[in-house]
Amino acid sequence: MWLETRRANRVNRLELAILSSGFVIRLLFGAIEMKIELSPWIILCSGLLALMIAVGKRRSDLEQLSTQNSVTRRSLRGYSLEFLDQVNTLLASVTIMSYLLFSTSTYALNSIGNGVLWTAPFVIFSILRYLQLVSVNKQGDDPTSMLLGDNITIILFSIWLILFTSIIALIILATTIFVFKN
């Protein structure tokens, strides 16, 4: 990424913050381009998810290098597998809480309705599945292939997407019917 510099790669946590902030910046520019107002909770969730994926990738890098008994990346020197597992557990917890807070926020209630909370179990199970793939199955080296190649993740995401879009469609339908009746 263009913000990742040699110096940032030497400071491990700074490197992760810069990497994950790139995803948030793209989200913000996309929202500006599409003229969509984003909830602060969605921005926070996106940043936390990006950070979680970056930590999982670094965990995989460290695990692969530990078998070679050499650390080629300076940024990996400040990490251990245990530390990265703890960070990912913390990030997963905070991400889930952020999504739950989004689901019950006035922004979500006013724009989408209270049905968003019904999507939360699929978010929780998806995050738990990600942690399982990274920590147990040791598949964090290529996050995109890992997530797109895992049938359980695809099913969970599909159910979440169908449920979320159905909630929005029902809100639009109910609003349209209400407008025509009045």
PLM segments and residue spans:
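A mobile, often basic/glycine-rich helix-loop segment
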Residues: 17-19
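Catalytic beta-strand/loop signature of glycosyltransferases that borders the donor
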Residues: 14
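C-terminal membrane-associated helical module and adjoining short loops/tails
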Residues: 6-11, 24-182
